[in-house]
Amino acid sequence: MKRIVLDASAVMAFFENRTGAEKVEELIGLAVQGKGELLMSVVNWGEVYYSIWRTKGEAAAKTALAEIAQLPIQIVLADFEVTKLAAEFKAQHKLPYADCFVAALTKLRRASLMATDRDFRAVARVISLQLI
């Protein structure tokens, strides 16, 4: 594992113990050992926050954010460069706009994207993709 960008779908799988949770847990363990780097776009971090809030309530959402803060995941802000590339992905591919941010971060950081969302197949020729 070198550098992995986690999509909201992968983080949600981890928190909800769904298919792929064990892979995310393995990556977290490797990052703790210093054997790789985990990144997440702040836009996708926000997706996790609102998704948990909608399904489990505000308290659960705030607890999840506190738990994410304890994990070896670097939350990357959406600066001009990331936002520009996200907009270009949106213009060229059938992909939700929030997903374009994680794709842009993946490309700019020369990383591999870990996701459960099959929509990312639309950009699989442009970025390294690992579907779980």
Predicted features by range, described:
Residues 1-40, 53-66, 130-132:
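Short, well-structured N-terminal submotif of metal-dependent ribonuclease cores
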Residues 11-12, 45, 120-121:
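A generic structural signal for short hydrophobic patches within well-formed alpha-helices
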Residues 32, 69, 107:
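Anion (oxyanion) recognition and catalysis
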Residues 74-114:
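Active-site neighborhoods of divalent-metal-dependent phosphate/nucleic-acid chemistry enzymes
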